[in-house]
Amino acid sequence: MEGRRLLHVSRLVLTRVLHLATAALIDGGERYAQRAIREMLAAARFTDWNPSHYLDVAEMTLALAIGYDWLYDQLTEAERDVVATAIIEKGILPSLDPAAVPWWVNSRNNWNQVCHAGLTAGALAVAERDPALAEKIVARAVEKVPLAAGSYAPDGAYVEGTMYWGYGTSFQVMLVDMLEGVLGHDGGLTAAPGFLASAQYILQATGPSGEFFNYADARADRPFAVPLFWFARRMDAPGLLRTDLANLDGALVSIRATPSREVARLFPLALLWWQPEFLERNTAHPETQPLHWLAKGPVPVGVHRSSWGPDAIYIAVNGGCPASPHGHMDGGGFVLEADGVRWAVDPGMQEYHSLEKLGVSLWDRRAEGERWKVFRLGPEGHNILRFDDAPQLPEGATPVVGFRADGDWPHTILDLSALYADQTTCVWRGVALCQGGGVLIQDEWTAREGGDPEVCWQMLTRADVSLEGNNVLLSQSGKKFHLRIQEPTDALIEVIDVSAPVHFYDVPNPGLSKIRVRMRAGSGREGVLRILGATTIAALATNIPTGPLATWA
């Protein structure tokens, strides 16, 4: 066990069984099958699969279901009995206790997708032994998974962020394949609003550097996206695979360097979904993908890039409230790239176990909750606006109030007022990609009467930072990027080293600095902060939008 989780063990079993069973089917060699069977029998003999944390059960059930189905002919009758009994008694039945219905059954996050898919795999694998049980589990999944599929609506941006898109979506596409393969229908799961569009979301949330726009609980390192192979086949869209095919060699090196290999536990499924003709066609599509993209929803995302090349200018911004599943205090947060360098960074999530083992109340999402004191989860670790260094409010909608994909300055504008309602009456953030080669981040606010909070604009970077007047020069990897505080001209600019842990439970952030721009809000007054960015000084003054955000149409 790792804390309260057996998940790393379940994932190790899934990794081994899926890879070995795939090798056995391709090679026909008995040695792969027998090793997979040994893994299955060992897991089947566990006392239980830790139903107190049902993700562990779901992934273990999936592992044994795949092995039972794919290696059925290699299993002896006695081995089939052992594995099938474990699937039913340790995988499925604990979820059917009428006195204690697991919370995930009706949840709206990735647990729903993972658990229902894993148990459906088990139920279908052993359906000949208990048809009524299989029918019950399948019917439950078809009824309940749409609750979580709402996370894609309306345009594909997954509420829990890019990393958990990979987790929840992997299991949902497996569930669809199971239903179609066995029952001939998908239960309507692919018709969920935004579900198919979420493939475009992952494409857009991958920056020119190859890193993720890693808002919420996510890492910047983009893993090999196995589900995209399913989407590419489903939609006949080989362009979706451009990044993964280009980085395949690097992905394999990373996989081999990871002892548990759990990061690639579903890798063989890419082989099943791969279409050989895509190899010739996948390079023909990238230029047809949009340069400017918006997804509305509970956690809206706006993306703007100058091209699909590796040196493109790229800025992506997210809304959303911190109390969302796997949310951070990052409403209005952004990442920024140019010349192949990520200049504005999100340091990413901190592993749960590292916090839980030290007693951090990680899932307390109240405004005063301990979750928001963790550097990487709270306001300190994000590129956001703050008032008197206070945290954002954890609840509230952040709607898109403006978006444009053409003209001299394609842009996204978010209404972040709900996140600062205790100190302001209105807060908007707009980001624009200017045709002259620059970007503009413009914030506008109205402080409440009787209050005069200090406004702080903050941006995290791993670049070397130098200040001169109202200009900031970033240097990294032999490249340079310029920031200019255009308005107001008298704002205070400072740079703080945030590489060392703030609290005993925080992890280090090597090379990380925070740029802060400070000014007074003014009681009851409307305020504005305009910050320009570009790779050259000349681009800072070319085709820049002027005026309030409301006039950017």
Write out the residue ranges for each language-model feature.
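Beta-sandwich/jelly-roll carbohydrate-recognition scaffolds of carbohydrate-active enzymes
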Residues: 1-4, 290-293, 298-301, 440-441, ...
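CBM-like, beta-strand-rich accessory domains located in the C-terminal region of large
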Residues: 249-258, 262, 354-553
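A residue-level signal for conserved active-site and pocket-lining positions in enzyme catalytic cores
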Residues: 64, 119, 304, 443, ...
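Aromatic-lined, polymer-binding surfaces characteristic
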Residues: 2-212, 218-219, 428
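Histidine-centered active-site/metal-ligand motif
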Residues: 56, 111, 164, 325-331, ...
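Terminal accessory carbohydrate-recognition/targeting modules of carbohydrate-active enzymes
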Residues: 306-379, 527, 533
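Carbohydrate-active enzyme catalytic cores, enriched for enzymes
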Residues: 103, 126, 167-344, 402-409, ...
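Replace the tail clause
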Residues: 74-77, 293, 474
